[in-house]
Amino acid sequence: MNSPVRDDHWLLSRLDYLWTKHFSDVDQKNKVFIKFGRAAKYRFGSIRLDPKKDASLILINGMFKDEKVPVKVVDHTIAHELVHYTHGFSSPHKKQYSHPHKGGVIDKEMLQRGLGDLIKAYKSWLKDYRKSLKPVVRKRRSRRLIRIRWI
């Protein structure tokens, strides 16, 4: 069975699905674009507001183009960014909190919206993903003795 190609059109369909099913009460007060960004080890998604274009841009980690990453993990990342949009971060909505992750508001909001299965799938995947990362070994720099001569 062929699965759809993971490209920006696929991301837009995932965003549309999540917004329609779980965020239908949230007004889209500006244009919202979504696309894959560059691959990164630790940042899976981001949202930013471009006031010149009156648009919000959601960037999803380019690593998520790989079908080895479960769809639920991609959906979790998109939903996470939609919660930021809902709470007024990088969107024209009124800011509801002083900090975007204050007191676990993202997971609380996602649970209220019936997205607990995405949280569970994401945390399970994240545990395995972290194990797959090679530990970074840093050599300690040896300290050189510097002699200062006073003349």
Regions found by a protein language model. Give the residues of each.
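Active-site-proximal or metal-binding-adjacent scaffold patches in catalytic folds
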Residues: 1-75, 85-151
